[in-house]
Amino acid sequence: MRGSELSLLLLALVLCQAPRGPAAPVSTGAGGGTVLAKMYPRGSHWAVGHLMGKKSTDELPPLYAADRDGLKEQLRGYIRWEEAARNLLGLLEAAGNRSHQPPQDQPLGSLQPTWDPEDGSYFSDAQNAKLVDSLLQVLKGKEGTAS
């Protein structure tokens, strides 16, 4: 045996000969159960009592109920802005795709104006009109929630 093995063996022998203290009682009580069973009457499982005092989440205090309505309205506003942004991005992508297309060979006299000055319509494109309508809806909704 080496020196370290010998010292471990001697330590084990000394520890085996040491008297047992009251740290781990094994005596049985009057009811036939162990002392530990009396200390933990509901069982000795480690999770016993872990959820004791857990509050119910079914009922919310009135403070949170009032905030919930405001949060719903705020969420609706965000959804409106998101829809408007999607419409705008779609229009920008469509405009970008049109600008990257090579020009078609047309005589100069046959070019159509982008808007008709007689009827005053600046938005002849259906997509531009849709964008303006959605932005107006969002702004009207924003004005309605501000007051």
UniProtKB/Swiss-Prot annotation:
One of its GO terms (biological process) is social behavior. It is found in: Secreted; Cytoplasmic vesicle, Secretory vesicle lumen; Cell projection, Neuron projection. Residues 98-113 have a biased composition (Polar residues). Residues 1-23 form the signal peptide. The keyword Ligase does not apply. GO terms for molecular function: neuropeptide hormone activity. It comes from the Eukaryota. One of its GO terms (cellular component) is neuronal dense core vesicle. Keywords: Amidation, Cell projection, Cleavage on pair of basic residues, Cytoplasmic vesicle, Mast cell degranulation, Secreted, Signal. Residues 95-123 are annotated as: Disordered. Residues 56-147 form a propeptide. Disulfide bonds: none annotated. The modification Methionine amide is found at residue 52. The keyword Signal applies. Expressed in several dozen cells in the dorsal retrotrapezoid nucleus/parafacial respiratory group (at protein level). Belongs to the bombesin/neuromedin-B/ranatensin family. Stimulates the release of gastrin and other gastrointestinal hormones. Contributes to the perception of prurient stimuli and to the transmission of itch signals in the spinal cord that promote scratching behavior. Contributes primarily to nonhistaminergic itch sensation. In one study, shown to act in the amygdala as part of an inhibitory network which inhibits memory specifically related to learned fear. This is Gastrin-releasing peptide. It comes from Rattus norvegicus (Rat). The gene is Grp.
